């Protein structure tokens, strides 16, 4: 049980770091992401995850930023994805910063609660996994989202896009934690 409490604290700390960055970017850009249609958001997630995988394989970054900031971006874009699923996309920035932060906090809390339930059932299995596995699982979730989008959301037995966003967020938080330890 002590490990699960440690995980909860680390998860909350990682989300707090992501939130602080999100809030600063919101100040700089407002909620410009409101314009993103679902497929563009999926492609943005893909770009971030693909870069992580590329850096893991090449062991070198010519841009200078490493893997950890990309996991943070995946967390924030995953939460943006949940907001967009909830609110729909817009043609203009139609949300003030306060509302954006309220929604951010709502979905971050949902991700935390989901992690707690899954971590209980899976008994801290994430701690024994490699960071590269998180990357591959995230890429798999993105491919699933693409297929669900191609099907117009009409799945037979699969979880929806929201569940895949939640899993992306959780795997990315685990990546941030592992790269912080």
Whereabouts are the PLM-identified features?
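Intrinsically disordered, low-complexity regulatory regions
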Residues: 1-181
């Amino acid at each position: 049980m002590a490990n699960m409490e440690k995980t909860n604290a680390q998860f909350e700390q990682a989300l707090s770091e992501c939130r602080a960055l999100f809030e600063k970017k919101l100040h700089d850009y407002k909620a410009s992401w409101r314009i993103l249609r679902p497929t563009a958001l999926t492609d943005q997630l893909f770009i971030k995850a693909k870069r992580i995988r590329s850096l893991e394989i090449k062991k070198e970054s010519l841009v200078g930023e490493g893997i950890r900031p990309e996991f943070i971006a995946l967390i924030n874009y995953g939460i943006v994805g949940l907001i967009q699923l909830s609110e729909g996309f817009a043609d203009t920035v139609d949300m003030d910063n306060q509302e954006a932060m309220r929604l951010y906090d709502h979905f971050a809390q949902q991700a935390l609660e989901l992690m707690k339930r899954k971590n209980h059932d899976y008994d801290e299995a994430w701690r024994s996994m490699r960071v590269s596995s998180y990357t591959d699982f995230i890429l798999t979730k993105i491919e699933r989202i693409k297929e669900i989008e191609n099907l117009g959301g009409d799945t037979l037995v699969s979880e929806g896009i929201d569940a895949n966003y939640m899993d992306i967020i959780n795997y990315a938080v685990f990546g941030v934690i592992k790269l912080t330890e």
